Amino acid sequence: MALDIERIKEELSQATVLELKQLIDALKEAWGVTAAAPVAVAAAPAAGAAAAPAEEKTEFDVILKEAGAKKLEVIKELRAITGLGLKEAKDLAEKGGPVKEGVSKQEAEEIKKKLEAVGAVVELK
């Protein structure tokens, strides 16, 4: 059975973002694949060269260590970042813990910057 590439392209062009997301999830499940970027295989190092550096981490967890002196400002920022309710954000500010998990390096850095700007102590793992 030959694929009609143009027809498939037209169908996909008319699909909503939600429909495309569902299609992607169904294909991942059917084919047993993940969205992880493939890791390039490095060439063998030259004689005497050091081993290849470790893989760079792509997903980060943003951990709140301490709210600092401006706890109210930290709570407001936590609510804006996470969408948590007032009580949940207050508990997180008081006890510390994960703010967001499995985010990109750029997003993790932005969250850390926002929280540190209001006096919080934040760690990226």
From Swiss-Prot:
Q: Which CDD domains match?
A: Ribosomal_L7_L12
Q: List the disulfide bonds.
A: none
**Cellular component, GO, one term:** cytosolic large ribosomal subunit
Pfam families reported in the protein's UniProt record: Ribosomal_L12, Ribosomal_L12_N
Key words, A-Z: Phosphoprotein, Ribonucleoprotein, Ribosomal protein
Give the free-text PTM comment from the record: The ion at m/z 13016 is probably phosphorylated; treatment with phosphatase in the presence of kinase inhibitors decreases it weight. This form is only detected on 70S ribosomes and not in isolated ribosomal stalk complexes. The ion at m/z 12978 is suggested to be the N-acetylated form of the protein (L7). The ion at m/z 12964 is suggested to be consistent with dimethylation or formylation and is present in very small quantities in the sample.
Top-rank lineage group of the source organism: Bacteria
Report any one BP term from Gene Ontology. Answer: translation
Q: Which GO terms describe its molecular function?
A: mRNA binding; structural constituent of ribosome
**What is its quaternary makeup?**
Homodimer. Part of the 50S ribosomal subunit; present in 6 copies per ribosome. Forms part of the ribosomal stalk which helps the ribosome interact with GTP-bound translation factors. Forms a heptameric L10(L12)2(L12)2(L12)2 complex, where L10 forms an elongated spine to which 3 L12 dimers bind in a sequential fashion. Contacts protein L11.
UniProt lists the family membership as follows:
Belongs to the bacterial ribosomal protein bL12 family.
Q: Any idea what job this protein has?
A: Forms part of the ribosomal stalk which helps the ribosome interact with GTP-bound translation factors. Is thus essential for accurate translation. It extends beyond the surface of the 70S ribosome. The stalk is preferentially stabilized in 70S versus 50S crystals.
User: Which HAMAP family does this entry report, sorted A to Z?
Assistant: Ribosomal_bL12
Q: What is this protein called?
A: Large ribosomal subunit protein bL12
What lineage is this protein's organism placed in? Bacteria, Thermotogati, Deinococcota, Deinococci, Thermales
